[in-house]
Amino acid sequence: MRLPRYARLLLALASGALLAFSFPNYNFPLFAWPAVGMLVLACFEERPAISLLYGFLHGVTFYLLSVPWIDTVMHQYGNVDPLTAAGILGLLSVTLAVFPAVFAWAIALVSRKLPPGKNALFACVLSPFLWVALEYARTYLILGGFPWNLTGYAATASLGLLQLAAITGIYGLSFLVAAYSSLVVYAILAGRQVVWKAALVTTGALILAGVGGKYLVPAAVPHHVANLVQTDFPQSAEYPANWTQVHMNELTQLERISVSAAQESGEHPSLVVWPEVPAPFSFQDPMFTQLAQQIARESGGDFLVGIVDWRKDATGKWQASNTAVLLDSSGQRTFTYDKTHLVPFGEFVPYRRWLTFAGKLTADIGDFTPGSSFNVGKLPGGKFGVFICYEAIFPAEVREFTLHGAQLLINISNDGWFGRSAAPAQHLMMARVRAVENRRWLLRDTNNGFTASVDPYGRIVSEIPTDVRTELSAPYDFRQGLTPYVRFGDWFARLCILASFAFIILAFAQRQPQAAGKRKGSKSNG
């Protein structure tokens, strides 16, 4: 199929836009299913250098439309002017667009190196494997990785399809979306009736699984109730030293909410959870320490709370950690977890030596020191693992808690920094998949939303509205057993990496010089 360049360019831009529109707050998940194939079609038999541009523009479009809230965070809370904030969003979009650019370049290269007939098959078979391989690379490369809004999350709108994540992780769902899209493109390129029939049958099977699959997903019966307190503190770029004293009336209100909810829950001992530091909470603050211990004692159970934990290192220098702490019913500290995966430009400044301007972004909190272990805590009914905010988007890291014996997952987060943007809904969408991958109940407590209880199959069992100071009586249970994903990790994503290399090598091995020579001499479409 020969398309003019303007049509190819429009396909590339539209594919990026459709992929972005499949996520909150646009909420058109079906738009993701044709997106990858549209980019394949744009690059098929095109010059690799030009396809590199198509992929790059696809990526820039996708990020500008799907994570525009980065501009809001940087401007309102990062102490930077609007122009610099917009520049940071643009720089992130340009940097991450490298991954779809590589995808587009490879598809074009394979389709031009092989003779007609074979090239369409190879390009479309390679497509889902390479797409997943590059999403996996995005999870770890560049600033510690940014696997936000991976393609597979669009498929999680279907409870039935979502269950695949327990075997392959989120990457299997990305593969499913990309593979279907590529099959349809192959039907278009091949023009053969048998391929169209295969595409139609696949479409029917996906609709059946997507719509009817939820009826086959078993129920999960909870036996416990936790009290998740949504603190709803407004975010500020600066916090005065007397913040606790100034806000003591609000803290006392939260204490009443926490204690009364625990006493009324009928759960003995109870579990009260507060989110990731919504304000400058620290046990170096005597007033806050007294308040936290009082909540634990009066609730008659355990109290999990996010704090800034200050400690001296070997040289005597004070260092801060983003920490979750568990207090027992006597007010004693029984468990500590330090956040291991920090937010670049939010909790630390990468490449500080070169990016001197970025120090302003963490001026209000200083750099955090990352934790070094995925330790689990103990509750009367079993063991739990708690991951903090940004860590929810990294499947392999959450998996570590289950491997270390966690029977319950707890995610505490402060999404107040995102304002009323799409980010909190996107964050919940991704955290929900961690419950399925690990087959564990997930308790998610946030400062201003979305606070929810998610069962091991991805159902949101209970939640409360955003921007409200209240508590959620959240059902949960402790679960045993390990899913294939927990046992074997990112095996599917790594398989896609190997398959991508294998298909590219095979494509070059299949090359017919005379066909390649003819195409090389042919006139470029335009």
Regions found by a protein language model. Give the residues of each.
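Membrane-embedded alpha-helical bundles of multi-pass enzymes
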Residues: 1-215, 419-420, 431-434, 446-454, ...
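Soluble catalytic regions of membrane-associated enzymes that act on cell-envelope
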Residues: 213-345, 376-380, 386, 390-392, ...
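A structure-centric signal for secondary-structure junctions around beta-strands
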Residues: 64, 145-148, 221-225, 268-269, ...
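CN hydrolase (nitrilase-like) catalytic-core segments centered on the catalytic cysteine
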Residues: 96, 278-279, 284-305, 317, ...
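Flexible, glycine-rich phosphate/dinucleotide-binding loops
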Residues: 157, 235, 312, 333, ...
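Conserved hydrophobic/aromatic beta-strand scaffold that supports enzyme active sites
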Residues: 20, 105, 228, 324-326, ...
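Short, conserved active-site loops that position catalytic residues or coordinate cofactors/metal ions
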Residues: 23-38, 62-69, 73, 230-231, ...
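Active-site catalytic loop in hydrolytic enzyme cores
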Residues: 72-87, 114, 139-166, 320-395, ...
